Protein backbone atom coordinates (compact mmCIF):
# COMPACT_ATOMS: atom_id res chain seq x y z
CA UNK A 1 0.00 0.00 0.00
CA UNK A 2 2.68 2.52 1.03
CA UNK A 3 4.82 1.60 -1.99
CA UNK A 4 1.88 2.45 -4.25
CA UNK A 5 1.50 5.80 -2.45
CA UNK A 6 5.21 6.53 -2.95
CA UNK A 7 4.92 5.82 -6.65
CA UNK A 8 1.99 8.22 -6.92
CA UNK A 9 4.00 10.78 -4.92
CA UNK A 10 6.95 10.52 -7.32
CA UNK A 11 4.67 10.85 -10.33
CA UNK A 12 3.30 14.15 -9.00
CA UNK A 13 6.60 15.58 -7.76
CA UNK A 14 7.72 18.70 -9.65
CA UNK A 15 9.99 21.66 -9.06
CA UNK A 16 8.55 25.01 -8.03
CA UNK A 17 9.43 26.39 -11.47
CA UNK A 18 7.55 23.55 -13.17
CA UNK A 19 4.53 24.02 -10.91
CA UNK A 20 4.44 27.76 -11.62
CA UNK A 21 3.98 26.99 -15.33
CA UNK A 22 0.42 25.91 -14.51
CA UNK A 23 -0.53 29.58 -14.13
CA UNK A 24 -1.89 31.35 -17.20
CA UNK A 25 -2.68 35.01 -17.85
CA UNK A 26 -6.02 35.97 -16.31
CA UNK A 27 -5.90 33.16 -13.73
CA UNK A 28 -6.91 33.35 -10.09
CA UNK A 29 -4.26 31.82 -7.82
CA UNK A 30 -4.92 31.16 -4.13
CA UNK A 31 -2.37 30.55 -1.38
CA UNK A 32 -2.83 28.93 2.02
CA UNK A 33 -3.49 30.95 5.16
CA UNK A 34 -0.74 32.48 7.32
CA UNK A 35 2.20 30.13 7.80
CA UNK A 36 0.71 27.88 5.08
CA UNK A 37 1.15 30.57 2.43
CA UNK A 38 3.11 29.34 -0.61
CA UNK A 39 6.70 30.56 -0.56
CA UNK A 40 8.82 28.67 -3.11
CA UNK A 41 5.93 28.65 -5.59
CA UNK A 42 5.44 32.42 -5.33
CA UNK A 43 9.16 32.97 -5.82
CA UNK A 44 9.03 30.82 -8.96
CA UNK A 45 5.90 32.57 -10.22
CA UNK A 46 7.60 35.96 -9.84
CA UNK A 47 10.22 34.86 -12.39
CA UNK A 48 7.42 34.57 -14.97
CA UNK A 49 6.30 38.18 -14.57
CA UNK A 50 7.00 39.21 -18.16
CA UNK A 51 5.16 36.15 -19.53
CA UNK A 52 1.93 36.82 -17.62
CA UNK A 53 -0.76 39.47 -17.39
CA UNK A 54 -3.67 40.01 -15.03
CA UNK A 55 -2.91 37.17 -12.61
CA UNK A 56 -4.94 37.65 -9.42
CA UNK A 57 -3.60 36.18 -6.19
CA UNK A 58 -5.76 35.55 -3.11
CA UNK A 59 -4.16 35.08 0.28
CA UNK A 60 -4.88 35.53 3.99
CA UNK A 61 -2.26 36.97 6.37
CA UNK A 62 0.66 36.27 4.05
CA UNK A 63 3.39 35.30 6.50
CA UNK A 64 6.23 35.24 3.99
CA UNK A 65 7.86 37.50 1.44
CA UNK A 66 5.47 38.39 -1.39
CA UNK A 67 7.80 37.88 -4.35
CA UNK A 68 5.17 38.50 -7.03
CA UNK A 69 4.07 41.76 -5.39
CA UNK A 70 7.65 42.97 -5.07
CA UNK A 71 8.53 42.44 -8.74
CA UNK A 72 5.35 44.17 -9.92
CA UNK A 73 4.62 47.26 -7.79
CA UNK A 74 2.24 48.63 -10.43
CA UNK A 75 0.23 45.36 -10.45
CA UNK A 76 0.25 45.09 -14.22
CA UNK A 77 1.06 41.40 -14.02
CA UNK A 78 0.08 40.34 -10.49
CA UNK A 79 -2.65 41.73 -8.23
CA UNK A 80 -2.77 40.54 -4.63
CA UNK A 81 -6.06 40.27 -2.74
CA UNK A 82 -6.13 39.45 0.97
CA UNK A 83 -8.89 38.11 3.22
CA UNK A 84 -7.12 39.76 6.17
CA UNK A 85 -4.23 42.19 6.06
CA UNK A 86 -1.30 41.46 8.38
CA UNK A 87 2.35 40.47 8.23
CA UNK A 88 3.90 41.08 4.82
CA UNK A 89 0.52 42.16 3.41
CA UNK A 90 0.83 45.53 5.15
CA UNK A 91 3.77 46.49 2.97
CA UNK A 92 1.53 46.40 -0.09
CA UNK A 93 -1.96 47.37 1.11
CA UNK A 94 -3.29 50.48 -0.63
CA UNK A 95 -0.64 49.94 -3.34
CA UNK A 96 -0.87 46.61 -5.15
CA UNK A 97 -2.80 44.55 -2.60
CA UNK A 98 -6.53 44.83 -1.99
CA UNK A 99 -8.77 43.66 0.85
CA UNK A 100 -11.63 41.15 0.51
CA UNK A 101 -14.35 41.95 3.09
CA UNK A 102 -15.71 38.93 4.94
CA UNK A 103 -16.99 37.46 8.16
CA UNK A 104 -14.32 34.88 8.88
CA UNK A 105 -16.65 31.95 9.51
CA UNK A 106 -18.09 32.46 6.02
CA UNK A 107 -14.70 32.17 4.31
CA UNK A 108 -15.02 28.51 3.21
CA UNK A 109 -18.63 29.13 2.12
CA UNK A 110 -17.57 32.15 0.06
CA UNK A 111 -14.78 30.10 -1.52
CA UNK A 112 -17.24 27.38 -2.52
CA UNK A 113 -20.15 29.65 -3.44
CA UNK A 114 -19.31 33.21 -4.48
CA UNK A 115 -15.62 33.71 -5.26
CA UNK A 116 -14.41 33.68 -8.83
CA UNK A 117 -13.25 30.03 -8.98
CA UNK A 118 -9.58 29.46 -8.25
CA UNK A 119 -7.53 28.21 -11.16
CA UNK A 120 -4.46 27.22 -9.16
CA UNK A 121 -4.42 26.61 -5.38
CA UNK A 122 -1.12 26.22 -3.51
CA UNK A 123 -0.77 25.32 0.17
CA UNK A 124 2.36 24.79 2.25
CA UNK A 125 1.96 21.61 4.32
CA UNK A 126 3.67 18.74 6.14
CA UNK A 127 5.28 15.73 4.51
CA UNK A 128 2.98 12.88 3.47
CA UNK A 129 2.22 10.30 6.17
CA UNK A 130 2.09 6.51 5.74
CA UNK A 131 -1.59 6.68 4.82
CA UNK A 132 -1.05 9.18 2.00
CA UNK A 133 -2.27 12.26 3.86
CA UNK A 134 -0.68 15.70 3.94
CA UNK A 135 -1.49 17.71 7.07
CA UNK A 136 -2.20 21.42 6.65
CA UNK A 137 -0.17 22.13 9.78
CA UNK A 138 -0.67 25.54 11.30
CA UNK A 139 -3.84 26.40 9.42
CA UNK A 140 -6.98 24.49 8.49
CA UNK A 141 -8.91 27.72 7.86
CA UNK A 142 -10.26 27.17 4.34
CA UNK A 143 -7.72 24.76 2.87
CA UNK A 144 -10.21 22.05 1.95
CA UNK A 145 -12.57 24.56 0.35
CA UNK A 146 -9.66 25.90 -1.74
CA UNK A 147 -8.64 22.46 -2.91
CA UNK A 148 -12.21 21.34 -3.66
CA UNK A 149 -12.87 24.28 -5.96
CA UNK A 150 -9.51 24.77 -7.71
CA UNK A 151 -8.78 23.59 -11.25
CA UNK A 152 -5.20 22.69 -10.28
CA UNK A 153 -4.15 21.70 -6.75
CA UNK A 154 -0.54 22.00 -5.59
CA UNK A 155 1.05 21.22 -2.23
CA UNK A 156 4.37 22.72 -1.15
CA UNK A 157 5.89 20.30 1.37
CA UNK A 158 7.87 21.79 4.24
CA UNK A 159 9.26 19.22 6.67
CA UNK A 160 9.43 21.88 9.39
CA UNK A 161 5.66 22.43 9.38
CA UNK A 162 4.03 21.20 12.64
CA UNK A 163 1.58 18.32 12.25
CA UNK A 164 -1.69 19.52 13.76
CA UNK A 165 -4.26 16.88 14.59
CA UNK A 166 -7.98 17.26 13.87
CA UNK A 167 -10.60 18.26 14.28
CA UNK A 168 -11.90 18.29 10.81
CA UNK A 169 -10.64 19.34 7.36
CA UNK A 170 -7.05 19.42 8.64
CA UNK A 171 -5.52 17.23 5.91
CA UNK A 172 -5.70 16.19 2.26
CA UNK A 173 -5.10 12.82 0.58
CA UNK A 174 -2.58 12.49 -2.23
CA UNK A 175 -5.37 11.38 -4.57
CA UNK A 176 -6.80 14.90 -4.32
CA UNK A 177 -3.51 16.56 -5.33
CA UNK A 178 -2.26 17.33 -8.84
CA UNK A 179 1.32 18.40 -8.10
CA UNK A 180 3.74 18.27 -5.18
CA UNK A 181 6.68 20.60 -4.60
CA UNK A 182 9.45 19.60 -2.21
CA UNK A 183 10.25 23.00 -0.72
CA UNK A 184 13.58 24.29 0.54
CA UNK A 185 12.31 23.57 4.08
CA UNK A 186 12.77 27.15 5.24
CA UNK A 187 11.90 27.89 8.89
CA UNK A 188 8.22 28.47 9.58
CA UNK A 189 7.42 32.17 10.09
CA UNK A 190 7.26 33.21 13.73
CA UNK A 191 5.83 36.30 15.39
CA UNK A 192 7.04 37.72 18.67
CA UNK A 193 4.80 38.26 21.67
CA UNK A 194 4.10 41.94 22.24
CA UNK A 195 5.13 43.06 25.71
CA UNK A 196 2.01 44.50 27.34
CA UNK A 197 2.07 48.18 28.24
CA UNK A 198 0.84 49.48 31.61
CA UNK A 199 -2.44 50.44 29.90
CA UNK A 200 -2.87 46.94 28.46
CA UNK A 201 -2.10 45.40 31.85
CA UNK A 202 -4.79 47.61 33.41
CA UNK A 203 -7.33 46.47 30.79
CA UNK A 204 -6.40 42.85 31.36
CA UNK A 205 -6.88 43.30 35.10
CA UNK A 206 -10.45 44.51 34.57
CA UNK A 207 -11.17 41.39 32.50
CA UNK A 208 -9.45 38.96 34.86
CA UNK A 209 -11.78 40.10 37.63
CA UNK A 210 -14.72 38.82 35.52
CA UNK A 211 -13.27 35.34 34.86
CA UNK A 212 -14.05 32.22 36.83
CA UNK A 213 -13.29 28.48 36.82
CA UNK A 214 -14.52 26.68 33.73
CA UNK A 215 -14.54 29.66 31.36
CA UNK A 216 -13.82 28.83 27.71
CA UNK A 217 -11.58 31.56 26.33
CA UNK A 218 -11.00 33.07 22.90
CA UNK A 219 -8.03 35.42 22.62
CA UNK A 220 -6.83 37.60 19.81
CA UNK A 221 -3.26 38.77 19.37
CA UNK A 222 -1.53 41.68 21.08
CA UNK A 223 -0.51 43.11 24.41
CA UNK A 224 -3.83 42.76 26.24
CA UNK A 225 -4.36 39.07 25.37
CA UNK A 226 -0.75 38.39 26.37
CA UNK A 227 -1.35 40.17 29.66
CA UNK A 228 -4.51 38.12 30.22
CA UNK A 229 -2.54 34.93 29.53
CA UNK A 230 0.17 35.89 32.02
CA UNK A 231 -2.38 36.83 34.68
CA UNK A 232 -4.37 33.63 34.20
CA UNK A 233 -1.16 31.59 34.45
CA UNK A 234 -0.39 33.26 37.79
CA UNK A 235 -3.97 33.02 39.10
CA UNK A 236 -5.85 30.28 40.93
CA UNK A 237 -8.27 29.80 38.02
CA UNK A 238 -8.69 26.21 36.87
CA UNK A 239 -10.40 23.95 34.33
CA UNK A 240 -10.35 26.59 31.60
CA UNK A 241 -11.23 25.68 28.03
CA UNK A 242 -10.01 26.91 24.65
CA UNK A 243 -12.11 27.52 21.53
CA UNK A 244 -10.52 30.12 19.27
CA UNK A 245 -9.68 31.02 15.71
CA UNK A 246 -6.03 31.82 16.46
CA UNK A 247 -3.84 29.79 18.79
CA UNK A 248 -1.23 32.13 20.26
CA UNK A 249 1.54 32.05 22.86
CA UNK A 250 -0.79 33.30 25.58
CA UNK A 251 -2.48 29.89 25.50
CA UNK A 252 0.90 28.21 25.84
CA UNK A 253 1.52 30.20 29.02
CA UNK A 254 -1.81 29.07 30.47
CA UNK A 255 -1.30 25.46 29.40
CA UNK A 256 2.18 25.27 30.94
CA UNK A 257 0.70 26.58 34.19
CA UNK A 258 -1.87 23.79 34.18
CA UNK A 259 -4.86 26.11 33.81
CA UNK A 260 -6.31 24.50 30.68
CA UNK A 261 -8.10 21.17 30.93
CA UNK A 262 -11.30 21.68 28.94
CA UNK A 263 -13.03 19.48 31.50
CA UNK A 264 -16.06 21.75 31.72
CA UNK A 265 -16.54 22.47 28.01
CA UNK A 266 -20.05 21.90 26.69
CA UNK A 267 -18.69 20.54 23.40
CA UNK A 268 -15.25 19.26 22.33
CA UNK A 269 -14.57 18.40 25.96
CA UNK A 270 -10.86 18.21 26.88
CA UNK A 271 -9.82 19.57 23.47
CA UNK A 272 -8.25 22.95 22.74
CA UNK A 273 -10.00 23.89 19.50
CA UNK A 274 -8.49 26.33 16.98
CA UNK A 275 -8.30 27.05 13.26
CA UNK A 276 -4.81 28.47 12.83
CA UNK A 277 -1.69 29.10 14.89
CA UNK A 278 0.89 31.87 14.73
CA UNK A 279 3.53 32.58 17.32
CA UNK A 280 6.91 31.37 18.56
CA UNK A 281 8.80 28.24 17.57
CA UNK A 282 8.03 26.95 21.06
CA UNK A 283 4.33 27.28 20.22
CA UNK A 284 4.77 25.29 17.00
CA UNK A 285 6.65 22.59 18.91
CA UNK A 286 3.78 22.44 21.40
CA UNK A 287 1.01 22.04 18.83
CA UNK A 288 2.98 19.49 16.80
CA UNK A 289 1.32 16.06 17.05
CA UNK A 290 -0.44 17.14 20.27
CA UNK A 291 -3.64 15.10 20.82
CA UNK A 292 -4.90 17.65 23.33
CA UNK A 293 -5.48 20.14 20.51
CA UNK A 294 -7.90 19.92 17.58
CA UNK A 295 -7.55 21.88 14.35
CA UNK A 296 -10.77 22.71 12.48
CA UNK A 297 -11.78 24.70 9.44
CA UNK A 298 -12.89 28.21 10.32
CA UNK A 299 -16.54 27.57 9.46
CA UNK A 300 -16.61 25.46 12.63
CA UNK A 301 -14.39 27.40 15.04
CA UNK A 302 -15.90 30.77 14.20
CA UNK A 303 -19.49 29.78 13.58
CA UNK A 304 -21.48 31.90 16.08
CA UNK A 305 -23.96 29.06 16.57
CA UNK A 306 -21.16 26.67 17.49
CA UNK A 307 -19.68 29.21 19.90
CA UNK A 308 -23.13 29.76 21.40
CA UNK A 309 -23.26 26.09 22.41
CA UNK A 310 -20.27 26.55 24.72
CA UNK A 311 -21.37 27.72 28.17
CA UNK A 312 -19.38 30.40 30.01
CA UNK A 313 -17.65 31.57 26.84
CA UNK A 314 -15.33 34.59 27.03
CA UNK A 315 -14.19 36.47 23.92
CA UNK A 316 -11.38 39.04 24.19
CA UNK A 317 -10.52 41.20 21.19
CA UNK A 318 -9.18 44.66 20.39
CA UNK A 319 -10.21 47.60 18.24
CA UNK A 320 -9.01 50.94 16.93
CA UNK A 321 -11.90 53.18 17.98
CA UNK A 322 -15.53 53.17 19.13
CA UNK A 323 -18.19 55.86 18.87
CA UNK A 324 -20.81 56.89 21.40
CA UNK A 325 -23.41 54.73 19.66
CA UNK A 326 -21.28 51.64 20.30
CA UNK A 327 -20.14 51.14 16.71
CA UNK A 328 -16.70 49.53 16.72
CA UNK A 329 -13.97 49.97 14.12
CA UNK A 330 -11.18 47.38 14.33
CA UNK A 331 -9.82 47.49 10.80
CA UNK A 332 -9.12 50.97 9.46
CA UNK A 333 -8.04 54.48 10.39
CA UNK A 334 -10.51 56.47 8.38
CA UNK A 335 -10.12 55.13 4.84
CA UNK A 336 -6.59 53.81 5.52
CA UNK A 337 -6.92 50.04 5.74
CA UNK A 338 -5.11 48.34 8.63
CA UNK A 339 -6.27 44.73 9.06
CA UNK A 340 -9.77 43.31 8.51
CA UNK A 341 -12.95 42.13 10.16
CA UNK A 342 -11.40 38.73 10.81
CA UNK A 343 -13.30 36.71 13.36
CA UNK A 344 -14.11 39.53 15.75
CA UNK A 345 -17.77 39.84 14.81
CA UNK A 346 -18.13 36.04 14.77
CA UNK A 347 -17.01 35.79 18.38
CA UNK A 348 -18.78 38.96 19.55
CA UNK A 349 -22.07 37.44 18.39
CA UNK A 350 -21.32 33.87 19.44
CA UNK A 351 -20.05 34.76 22.91
CA UNK A 352 -23.12 36.83 23.71
CA UNK A 353 -25.40 33.93 22.74
CA UNK A 354 -23.46 31.56 25.02
CA UNK A 355 -24.98 30.82 28.43
CA UNK A 356 -23.25 33.31 30.78
CA UNK A 357 -21.15 34.42 27.79
CA UNK A 358 -19.07 37.59 27.81
CA UNK A 359 -17.54 39.55 24.93
CA UNK A 360 -14.88 42.17 25.67
CA UNK A 361 -13.48 44.58 23.09
CA UNK A 362 -10.41 46.42 24.35
CA UNK A 363 -8.83 49.72 23.41
CA UNK A 364 -6.58 52.23 25.18
CA UNK A 365 -8.58 55.36 25.94
CA UNK A 366 -6.22 57.59 23.95
CA UNK A 367 -3.71 57.53 21.13
CA UNK A 368 -0.83 59.89 20.38
CA UNK A 369 -0.12 60.70 16.73
CA UNK A 370 2.59 63.20 15.81
CA UNK A 371 2.62 64.61 19.32
CA UNK A 372 -1.14 65.07 19.53
CA UNK A 373 -3.16 62.99 21.98
CA UNK A 374 -6.74 62.18 20.97
CA UNK A 375 -9.51 60.04 22.41
CA UNK A 376 -10.19 56.61 20.91
CA UNK A 377 -13.77 56.95 22.16
CA UNK A 378 -15.27 59.36 19.66
CA UNK A 379 -18.68 61.01 19.17
CA UNK A 380 -18.82 59.43 15.72
CA UNK A 381 -16.30 57.21 14.00
CA UNK A 382 -13.59 58.88 11.93
CA UNK A 383 -15.06 59.58 8.46
CA UNK A 384 -14.39 56.58 6.26
CA UNK A 385 -13.80 54.22 9.19
CA UNK A 386 -15.21 50.74 8.68
CA UNK A 387 -17.80 49.44 11.14
CA UNK A 388 -16.49 46.05 12.24
CA UNK A 389 -19.11 45.48 14.94
CA UNK A 390 -22.49 47.23 14.62
CA UNK A 391 -23.88 48.83 17.74
CA UNK A 392 -26.46 46.05 17.95
CA UNK A 393 -23.70 43.47 18.46
CA UNK A 394 -21.30 45.21 20.86
CA UNK A 395 -21.48 43.76 24.37
CA UNK A 396 -18.72 45.25 26.55
CA UNK A 397 -15.98 47.79 25.86
CA UNK A 398 -12.81 47.93 27.97
CA UNK A 399 -10.28 50.72 28.54
CA UNK A 400 -7.74 51.17 31.31
CA UNK A 401 -10.47 53.04 33.20
CA UNK A 402 -12.98 50.21 33.34
CA UNK A 403 -15.66 48.25 31.50
CA UNK A 404 -18.72 49.69 29.75
CA UNK A 405 -21.69 47.38 29.17
CA UNK A 406 -23.68 48.35 26.07
CA UNK A 407 -26.10 45.48 25.50
CA UNK A 408 -29.60 46.34 26.67
CA UNK A 409 -28.71 50.03 27.00
CA UNK A 410 -30.45 52.97 25.28
CA UNK A 411 -28.48 55.55 23.34
CA UNK A 412 -28.10 57.88 26.34
CA UNK A 413 -27.11 54.98 28.60
CA UNK A 414 -24.48 53.88 26.09
CA UNK A 415 -23.07 57.38 25.90
CA UNK A 416 -22.89 57.53 29.68
CA UNK A 417 -21.22 54.12 29.94
CA UNK A 418 -18.62 54.92 27.30
CA UNK A 419 -17.80 58.39 28.59
CA UNK A 420 -17.21 56.90 32.04
CA UNK A 421 -14.34 54.81 30.66
CA UNK A 422 -12.96 57.58 28.42
CA UNK A 423 -9.84 59.45 29.48
CA UNK A 424 -10.83 62.20 31.97
CA UNK A 425 -9.19 64.84 29.76
CA UNK A 426 -11.79 64.16 27.05
CA UNK A 427 -14.93 63.48 29.05
CA UNK A 428 -16.29 67.04 29.06
CA UNK A 429 -15.81 67.33 25.31
CA UNK A 430 -17.57 64.01 24.75
CA UNK A 431 -20.50 65.13 26.93
CA UNK A 432 -20.89 68.27 24.81
CA UNK A 433 -20.86 66.21 21.62
CA UNK A 434 -23.38 63.75 23.09
CA UNK A 435 -25.67 66.69 23.88
CA UNK A 436 -25.45 67.89 20.27
CA UNK A 437 -26.29 64.36 19.12
CA UNK A 438 -29.34 64.24 21.42
CA UNK A 439 -28.06 61.18 23.28
CA UNK A 440 -27.42 62.87 26.64
CA UNK A 441 -29.83 63.64 29.47
CA UNK A 442 -29.35 66.34 32.06
CA UNK A 443 -29.41 63.65 34.74
CA UNK A 444 -26.58 61.66 33.13
CA UNK A 445 -23.52 61.12 35.27
CA UNK A 446 -19.90 60.38 34.52
CA UNK A 447 -18.58 60.35 38.07
From Swiss-Prot:
Domain of life: Bacteria
InterPro entries per the UniProt record, alphabetical: AcetylCoA_hyd_C, AcetylCoA_hyd_C_sf, ActCoA_hydro, ActCoA_hydro_N, Butryl-CoA_acetate_CoA_Tfrase, NagB/RpiA_transferase-like
A Gene Ontology molecular function term of the record: acetate CoA-transferase activity
Cellular component terms per the entry's GO annotation: cytoplasm
Induction behaviour: Expressed during syntrophic growth with butyrate (at protein level). Seems to be constitutively expressed.
Catalytic residues in the record: 245 (5-glutamyl coenzyme a thioester intermediate)
EC number(s) stated in the UniProt entry for this protein: 2.8.3.-
Keywords noted in UniProt: Cytoplasm, Fatty acid metabolism, Lipid metabolism, Transferase
Residues annotated as binding CoA: 220-224, 320, 343
Subcellular location per the Swiss-Prot or TrEMBL entry: Cytoplasm
GO BP field: acetate metabolic process; acetyl-CoA metabolic process; butyrate metabolic process
Catalytic activity: butanoate + acetyl-CoA = butanoyl-CoA + acetate
Pathway note: Lipid metabolism; butanoate metabolism
Predominant subcellular localization, coarse grouping: cytoplasm
Family the UniProt entry places it in: Belongs to the acetyl-CoA hydrolase/transferase family.
Function: Coenzyme A-transferase that converts butyrate to butyryl-CoA. Involved in the syntrophic growth of S.wolfei on butyrate in cooperation with methanogens or an appropriate hydrogen-scavenging bacterium, as part of the butyrate oxidation pathway.
Protein name: Probable butyrate:acetyl-CoA coenzyme A-transferase
UniProt organism field: Syntrophomonas wolfei subsp. wolfei (strain DSM 2245B / Goettingen)
Lineage: Bacteria, Bacillati, Bacillota, Clostridia, Eubacteriales
Amino acid sequence: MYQKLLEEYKSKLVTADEAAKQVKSGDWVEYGFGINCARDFDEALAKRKDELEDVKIRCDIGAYQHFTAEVDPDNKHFTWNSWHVAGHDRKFINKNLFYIPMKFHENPMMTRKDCVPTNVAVIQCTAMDKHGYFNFGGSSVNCCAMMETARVTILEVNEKMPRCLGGNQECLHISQVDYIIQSKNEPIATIGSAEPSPVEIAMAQHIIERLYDGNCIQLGIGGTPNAVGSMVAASDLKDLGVHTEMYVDAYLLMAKAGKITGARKSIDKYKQVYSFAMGSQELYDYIDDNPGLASYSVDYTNNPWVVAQIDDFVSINACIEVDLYGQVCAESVGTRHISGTGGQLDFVEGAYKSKNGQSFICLPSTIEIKGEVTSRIKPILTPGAIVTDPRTATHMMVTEFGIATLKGRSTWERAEELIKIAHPDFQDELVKEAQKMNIWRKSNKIG
